[in-house]
C-alpha cells in the first residue's frame, strides 16, 4: 500500500553533501555532560537509562549523570537486582510513569545480567565480547526481559563510542542510525525515503507491520547516506 522508494533520484548524495558542509569543520559527538565521571561510571549510567529510553526523553528532566552522583546505588547491579525501591527511585527521576510493569523487570533483569555475566560491570561488556559490535548487540538483545531492543542496543553502543568510553575492534560499520522522530522526519522531508502517500513520523510511531517496514527502510536509507558521505570524506582526505 505504501509503495516505498529508497533513494529514488540520488537524494542520499545530496543529503551527504549537506552533512559534509556542516560537519567537515566540526566534531560530531553526543552532547552529554558526563561531569568528569569515570568510564566505568558513564557506562553504568547509560546502560540503565538506555533501557528506559522508550516514549520518554531520559535527558529532558535533568542530567542522569548528575542524578548518579546523588544516588549511586540506583546504578549498582548487585544492589539493584533485588531492590524495587532503587528501581522506583530511578524511574521516578526519569519520569517513566507509563508501563511500569515492563520497566521494573527490565531494570531488575538487566542488573542480574551484569552480575551473572559481566562481573557486575557494564563497562566490561565491550572487553568480554572482544569489541565486536555484532556480538554485543546479540548479547544485549538475546532476551526481551533485559529491556534492550535492537534500537536501544545500537543507541547505547553509539553513545559509548561517541563519549570515548569504548573502542570497537570489529563490525563498527554495522552500527545503525536508529529510527526516531528526528531521523524519520528528515528522511521523509528530504525525500531519501519516499512513499506513495504523504506520511508523518509521529503517525508511524506505533507498533504495526507498516512501522516495522518503515523503520527498516529508514535505517537502510541512512546507511546509504553514510556510505555516500564516506566517499566524500575520502575524496577530501585524498586531496589534502
Please report, for each region that a protein language model flagged, where it lies by residue.
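HhH-family (HhH-GPD) DNA N-glycosylase catalytic core used in base-excision repair
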Residues: 1-240
